[in-house]
C-alpha cells in the first residue's frame, strides 16, 4: 500500500479505483487491480 499526500491523481490511474473513507482516513481501493491500493497520510 502506498502512502500519499494527495490521492486525487492516484484515483485517475485506473477506472476501477474508488475513494473510500474508513475510520477517519482516506483510501483508494481497487477490487480488480490490487496494486492501486493507497492511503492518505
From Swiss-Prot:
It comes from Methylorubrum extorquens (strain PA1) (Methylobacterium extorquens). The lineage of its organism: Bacteria, Pseudomonadati, Pseudomonadota, Alphaproteobacteria, Hyphomicrobiales. This is Large ribosomal subunit protein bL36. Belongs to the bacterial ribosomal protein bL36 family. One of its GO terms (molecular function) is structural constituent of ribosome. SUPFAM superfamilies: Ribosomal protein L36 (SSF57840). GO terms for cellular component: ribonucleoprotein complex; ribosome. The keyword Ribonucleoprotein applies. GO terms for biological process: translation. Pfam families: Ribosomal_L36 (PF00444). It comes from the Bacteria. Keywords: Ribonucleoprotein, Ribosomal protein. The keyword Ribonucleoprotein applies.
